[in-house]
């Protein structure tokens, strides 16, 4: 299955973005993870069908209520994100960060 990795830039922390992303991904039968980054962005990696990933990307550009998405960056090499879980998880720390 195709895999995609994104960084979402804007007001995306403290507004329920990770929970919303998880619900959206599960509804689309995607697996992967989402986490807050120390720089204030949200990072995620998902795999599934091309159609489901395209729907997720469209949703990410809008975001949930109370968020403001300024930009979505699609990363070229999501394979370096490592193995994905069997479902879609919220991760609480970026590798090497001391806080959420």
Curated annotation (Swiss-Prot):
Which residues act catalytically here?
18, 36
**Region feature (Disordered):** 76-100
Q: Which SUPFAM superfamilies does this UniProt record tie to the protein?
A: Acylphosphatase/BLUF domain-like (SSF54975)
- Enzyme class, first EC level, given as a word: hydrolase
Gene3D superfamilies referenced in this protein's UniProt entry, alphabetically? 3.30.70.100
Under Enzyme Commission nomenclature, its number is 3.6.1.7
Domain of life, per the record? Bacteria
What sequence ranges are listed for the domain Acylphosphatase-like? Answer: 3-92
UniProt keywords, alphabetically: Hydrolase
Q: What is a GO molecular function of this protein?
A: acylphosphatase activity
Q: Which PROSITE patterns match?
A: ACYLPHOSPHATASE_1 (PS00150), ACYLPHOSPHATASE_2 (PS00151), ACYLPHOSPHATASE_3 (PS51160)
Pfam families registered for this protein in UniProt:
Acylphosphatase (PF00708)
Is Hydrolase found in the keyword set? yes
Could you say which protein family the record assigns here? Belongs to the acylphosphatase family.
In Swiss-Prot or TrEMBL terms, this protein is called Acylphosphatase
What's the gene?
acyP
């Amino acid at each position: 299955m195709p895999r995609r990795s994104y960084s979402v830039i804007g007001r995306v922390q403290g507004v329920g973005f990770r929970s919303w992303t998880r619900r959206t991904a599960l509804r689309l039968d995607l697996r992967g993870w989402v986490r807050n980054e120390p720089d204030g962005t949200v990072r995620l990696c998902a795999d599934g069908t091309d159609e489901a990933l395209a729907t997720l990307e469209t949703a990410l550009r809008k975001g949930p209520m109370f968020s403001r998405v300024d930009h979505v960056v699609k990363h070229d090499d999501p394979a370096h994100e490592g193995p994905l879980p069997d479902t879609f998880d919220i991760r609480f720390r970026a590798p090497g960060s001391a806080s959420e």
